[in-house]
Design a protein with these regions (language model features):
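Non-ligating segments of multi-cofactor redox enzymes
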Residues: 1-239, 244-245, 250-506
């Protein structure tokens, strides 16, 4: 039986607390709407490796992360990756549950050393190919921030839209990858990190880092560090730590009874020439993968995914999803979106959803507040990959994302001979105005008329309409464009432009 641990616990505790702090910021930013949380979310998401690699103008972040990894090891995985911290958190919870049941003392193995599989190198290569050819589904499936973001988006859907059957089903579908990873983490720790495209890529650089975890000659091969390692990268019999898979959790230093596991210089000068060549070869491969993905991606958009041909042939209509303002078109949007769901979290109106399970879009089927706010640019502000291009408030006010269709035969003015005008009152651009309407035997009324030149597809008319079924429908446009702007009051002529007073007239 191993002696009581005499290793320094401070590094492991401090590192874990920092990682928990970063995770707490992520959870707060995803689940708490507001300008502060959106600012934090934009900063955190744009600092993620895959988002920076795939995003425009974020090459500096990629280079900084690679440089830090090349010197210190996988610091990014240690404290900045929220999915890694989630795995480690549940790994610790699993350990407490096993300890409570006494199973650890009866020899139930939790992780232990697992020989690395060379097949894992195929994951970042395939993802890099997807980045180059604008094929994001591969990244969406295996990327850590995408997986974590969809899980948080699922929780937000439950909180913001209630617990209906449809919402619950959607939330479960979005969270399935995260749930599976958490279940595996209970017993196998950070097993996903061995196959994560970001982890594998950074691992190549980490293997060449002069600093890292090392085992001294005083190691007694007791195996305690091997069992406690959430990454399964310690071979206690061989007295070796796999620097590629080590996530710098410092658990080994905290439990080592002889103090043999430590972080420091790994003896670069004493490494054989052959080993150095292996290190440099791995780092070179990683550099080529990252460089090709970042540099060639924008220039090879002509090699778009095959499904783009089908998407381009779709006509305007309800078959197209209504995309967030700044998404340009479906090809651009799906070719850059990594499904981190930061836009879902940032939307103050809670109308950005992901009913297709991957790429978010606008859903106007909710309550009466379900309209894209006229002055809001939050989704374009937090998007890390420019799938939603950044818009100014003035550009947002003129960006057409959909077109309304007015069915006057459904309007309460026509069906119930009641005064209304709610649609014209809430329309922010003046696409809807009121004109005189009369029928024999009914009092003087006004009716809405619609001018699509001013319509931006915000959905305010649909949200405010009291008719059943509603007198408006919305259809996405194939290509977002700028309208002529809002209708000036002096151009209304004989039309009666209803001023927005903040209250519906019924």
């Amino acid at each position: 039986m191993a002696r009581k641990s005499r290793g320094p616990k401070a590094p492991a505790v401090i590192r874990f607390l920092i990682a928990l702090g970063v995770l707490a910021l992520f959870v707060y930013a995803y689940l708490s709407p507001g300008l502060l949380s959106n600012g934090i979310l934009a900063l955190l998401v744009k600092g993620q490796f895959s988002a920076a690699l795939y995003g425009a103008g974020l090459a500096g972040i990629v280079l900084v992360l690679l440089a830090l990894t090349l010197i210190f090891g996988r610091l990014y995985c240690s404290v900045l990756c929220p999915l890694g911290t989630v795995q480690e958190l549940f790994w610790r919870v699993g350990g407490l549950l096993l300890r409570k049941k006494g199973k650890q003392e009866r020899g139930v193995a939790r992780r232990g050393y697992a020989a690395p599989s060379k097949a894992r190198y195929a994951v970042p290569l395939l993802v890099a190919a997807g980045v180059i050819f604008s094929f994001t589904p591969l990244m969406v499936i295996v990327d850590p921030i995408s997986t974590f973001g969809r899980g948080m988006g699922a929780l937000r859907s439950l909180f913001s839209q209630g617990g209906g059957t449809t919402v619950f089903t959607l939330a479960c579908a979005l969270a399935v990858p995260l749930i599976l990873i958490v279940i595996v983490a209970l017993l196998r720790g950070r097993a996903f990190c061995a196959w994560c495209p970001v982890g594998v890529t950074l691992g190549l650089f980490s293997s060449a880092a002069p600093l890292g975890m090392k085992v001294s000659a005083t190691c007694a091969s007791c195996g305690l560090c091997e069992v406690k390692c959430p990454a399964g990268c310690i071979d206690s019999k061989a007295k070796r730590i796999d620097s590629e898979r080590c996530v710098l959790c410092f658990s080994c230093t905290a439990v080592c009874p002889t103090g043999s596991a430590a972080y420091g210089v790994r003896g670069w000068a004493t490494v054989s020439g052959e080993a150095r060549r292996v290190f440099l070869k791995k780092a070179g491969k990683a550099s080529l993968v990252c460089g090709a993905a970042y540099l060639l991606g924008p220039s090879l958009k002509l090699f778009s995914r095959p499904s783009n041909v089908a998407l381009a042939s779709l006509s305007e209509g309800e078959t197209l999803p209504i995309l967030p303002p700044g998404a340009k078109n479906l090809i651009h949007y799906t070719g850059r979106c990594i499904a981190c769901h930061a836009c879902v979290a940032s939307c103050p109106a809670n109308i950005i959803t992901a009913k297709d399970g991957v790429h978010p879009h606008l859903d106007y089927s909710g309550d009466a507040t379900a309209a894209c706010q006229f002055n809001c640019i939050e989704c374009s502000s937090v998007c890390p990959t420019k799938a939603i291009t950044r818009l100014s408030v003035e550009e947002k006010r003129r960006t057409r994302i959909a077109l309304s269709t007015l069915y006057f035969e459904r309007c309460v003015v026509k069906t119930r001979h009641e005064s209304c005008g709610a649609c014209a009152e809430v329309c922010p651009t003046g696409a809807l105005t009121m004109v005189a309407y009369s029928e024999p035997g009914i009092p003087f009324l006004t009716m809405p008329i619609y001018d699509e030149r001013y319509c931006i597809g915000c959905g305010a008319c649909l949200a405010s309409c009291p008719a059943e079924p509603r007198a408006f429908t919305l259809a996405a446009v194939k290509e977002q464009s700028l309208t002529v702007g809002s209708r000036p009051l002096e151009e209304a002529g004989d039309e009666l432009r209803v001023e927005n007073t903040g209250d519906f007239p019924f």
